[in-house]
Swiss-Prot record:
The record marks H175 as: Important for dimerization. The active site is at H106 (proton donor). InterPro entries: Coprogen_oxidase_aer, Coprogen_oxidase_aer_sf. One of its GO terms (biological process) is protoporphyrinogen IX biosynthetic process. Its cofactor is Mn(2+). It comes from Escherichia coli (strain 55989 / EAEC). This is Oxygen-dependent coproporphyrinogen-III oxidase.
Length: 299
């Protein structure tokens, strides 16, 4: 089937609505919407929930941008895209909870198509979700990865292990020699066997995110915490900032294409701290995190 960008766009708009409704149901606070237009073509809807009952900040962004030429970040990766017009659309979200025992989560689903007269379109889907705990709970990690595995199974036995490994490899801070979190799923350049199959998988990922995340939020949101845990959460949020600004392809693509900076940087935590040569106390829960986030098979 020929790629249907309109169908994808409608799914993404509905997905943004659904996820915002689900997060509001857990938190009680409402999202504020900011609709925007991109001068070079396209626009989007940025939605932010701030200082809620559970979430310090949650951002759920829909964007649909188009242009006559590809940016350097994309043509370096895919030289066959040079000289083509493009459309890129997606939903991207990051949730930063108040409680340090509730992990930060990120999800993204996206579609890209590049066309020129007289040639077949070049298109692909991408996306996934990943979890960044500050304090590790095995039952949470197992639930997260089991949900990811189960949504992948209808698409093939090898899908979950392949996209889990890709996620582990992608969300890695080379300059720190550590994972960003415990991973999940990550896929890019997905265009086989055909459009319908790939679109169905992207829909499963988009819908599976809240199935994976919200039970963990419910389990941890009322746990008591103090200044020690909060300080550690703010320190570890620094890793999130470092990854997004140094390594994340999506952030670089957005900034290089003249994307909307406020929306691109909506993933940043509202508060964060760095501390020179921080070393957690031996045997402390904080010290245990470095071992917990090492790559392993959770299911």
């Amino acid at each position: 089937m020929k790629p249907d960008a309109h169908q994808v766009k409608q799914f993404l708009l509905n997905l943004q609505d659904t996820i915002c409704q689900q997060l509001t149901a857990v938190d009680g606070a409402e999202f504020v919407e900011d609709s925007w237009q991109r001068e070079a073509g396209g626009g989007g809807r940025s939605r932010v929930l701030r200082n809620g009952g559970v979430f310090e900040q949650a951002g759920v962004n829909f964007s649909h941008v188009h242009g006559e030429a590809m940016p350097a970040s994309a043509t370096a990766h895919r030289p066959e895209l040079a000289g083509r017009s493009f459309e890129a659309m997606g939903v991207s979200l990051v949730v930063h909870p108040h409680n340090p025992y509730v992990p930060t989560s990120h999800a993204n689903v996206r579609f890209f198509i590049a066309e020129k007269p007289g040639a077949e379109p070049v298109w692909w889907f991408g996306g996934g979700f990943d979890l960044t705990p500050f304090y590790g709970f095995e039952e949470d990690a197992i639930h997260w990865h089991r949900t990811a595995r189960d949504l992948c199974l209808p698409f093939g036995e090898d899908v979950y292990p392949r996209y889990k490994k890709w996620c582990d490899d992608y969300f890695y801070l080379k300059h720190r020699n550590e994972q960003r979190g415990i991973g999940g799923l990550f896929v890019d350049d997905l265009n086989t066997p055909d459009f319908d199959h790939c679109f169905a998988f992207m829909q499963a990922v988009g819908k599976g995110y809240t199935d994976a995340y919200l039970p963990i939020v419910e389990r941890r949101k009322a746990m008591a915490y103090g200044e020690r845990e909060r300080n550690f959460q703010l320190y570890r949020r620094g890793r999130y900032v470092e990854f997004n600004l140094v390594w994340d392809r999506g952030t670089l693509f957005g900034l290089q294409t003249g994307g909307r900076t406020e929306s691109i940087l909506m993933s940043m935590p509202p508060l964060v701290r760095w501390e020179y040569d921080y070393q957690p106390k031996d045997g402390s829960p904080e010290a245990a995190l470095s071992e917990f986030i090492k790559v392993r098979d959770w299911v």
